[in-house]
């Protein structure tokens, strides 16, 4: 990594660098655009261009200083047509006061004042110059500065500040937007000092698949129902006691042999109780007296 050209107070910490490496912000595409060559560190044997994350950090700080220089946060428009960046721009707008356009950009939003979505921002920040090309093109018509997250193969035409990073991975996109929001809040004074940790975790900026979330909720609900039904199936005796029936007797061990032979009697030869024989003669019939 090349030495930083920033003042010492803006230098990145080792934790910031580790986070960018973990989120794979340094992995660019195999194709390369000529204007992005100064931001590349080297090319791997498999053809993947590796981005210099030191340059990435410098551009994040530069972009944050430009954003913080605008008095009214509502004059900043953050845009992402790429699904992986839509959650990030919404969170960025919520934390910094900017206006978010997540999803399809309506043509004419910057040039046609008749449309309901017409806006006149002083600055726009886009996730990908390729997917957000319509917004960049209209911004060039009305002289709006553009900040963009650019990969190794991203077109840089009409882009004023390019932040070199991997703009195709959901973790890389979310992390760069999170770092940009944190630097803006630091420059505005919302965070007391650079040593103060931001209480917003970076996970909130990561893309989440709605279908995966619904599937997870359904599985959790089924697991909860199974846990509730488990005691009834495993302990049927509890239901019998609830109905007022007597629970079956249980034995702690094998009964002693002496208990069975205590009487010493033979069941085969024992006489019936009462001294009567089952083979006794029937009583004689008596004649009725009229």
From Swiss-Prot:
Q: Name one GO biological process term.
A: ribosomal small subunit assembly
A single GO cellular-component term from the record reads: cytosolic small ribosomal subunit
Q: Which segments carry the region annotation Disordered?
A: 252-290
Where is it located?
Cytoplasm
Could you cite one Gene Ontology molecular function of this protein?
Answer: structural constituent of ribosome
Organism superkingdom = Eukaryota
Q: Can you state the subunit structure given in the record?
A: Component of the small ribosomal subunit. Mature ribosomes consist of a small (40S) and a large (60S) subunit. The 40S subunit contains about 33 different proteins and 1 molecule of RNA (18S). The 60S subunit contains about 49 different proteins and 3 molecules of RNA (25S, 5.8S and 5S). Interacts with RPS21.
Family membership: Belongs to the universal ribosomal protein uS2 family.
Protein name (database record)? Small ribosomal subunit protein uS2
Lineage, broadest ranks: Eukaryota, Fungi, Dikarya, Ascomycota, Pezizomycotina
Q: What's the name of its gene? A: RPS0
């Amino acid at each position: 990594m090349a030495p930083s050209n920033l003042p010492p107070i803006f230098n990145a910490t080792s934790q910031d660098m580790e986070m960018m490496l973990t989120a794979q912000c340094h992995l660019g595409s195999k194709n390369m655009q000529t204007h992005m060559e100064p931001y590349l560190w080297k090319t791997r044997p498999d053809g993947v261009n590796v981005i210099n994350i030191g340059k990435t950090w410098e551009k994040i700080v530069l972009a944050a200083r430009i954003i913080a220089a605008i008095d009214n946060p509502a004059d900043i428009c953050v845009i992402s047509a790429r699904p992986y960046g839509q959650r990030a721009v919404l969170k960025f707008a919520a934390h910094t006061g900017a206006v978010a356009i997540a999803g399809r950009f309506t043509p004419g939003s910057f040039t046609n004042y008749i449309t309901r979505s017409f806006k006149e921002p002083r600055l726009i920040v886009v996730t990908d110059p390729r997917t957000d090309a319509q917004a960049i093109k209209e911004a060039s018509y009305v002289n709006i500065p553009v900040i963009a997250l650019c990969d190794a193969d991203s077109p840089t035409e009409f882009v004023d500040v390019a932040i070199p990073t991997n703009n195709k991975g959901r973790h890389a996109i979310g992390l760069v937007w999170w770092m940009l929001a944190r630097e803006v809040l630091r420059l505005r004074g919302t965070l007391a000092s650079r040593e103060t940790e931001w209480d917003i975790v970076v996970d909130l900026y990561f893309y989440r698949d709605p279908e995966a979330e619904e599937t997870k909720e359904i599985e959790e609900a089924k697991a909860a129902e199974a846990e509730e039904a488990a005691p009834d199936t495993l302990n049927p005796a509890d239901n019998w006691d609830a109905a007022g029936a007597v629970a079956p007797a249980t034995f702690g061990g094998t009964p002693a042999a002496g208990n069975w032979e205590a009487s010493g009697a033979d069941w085969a030869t024992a006489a019936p109780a009462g001294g009567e024989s089952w083979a006794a003669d029937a009583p004689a019939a008596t004649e009725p007296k009229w």
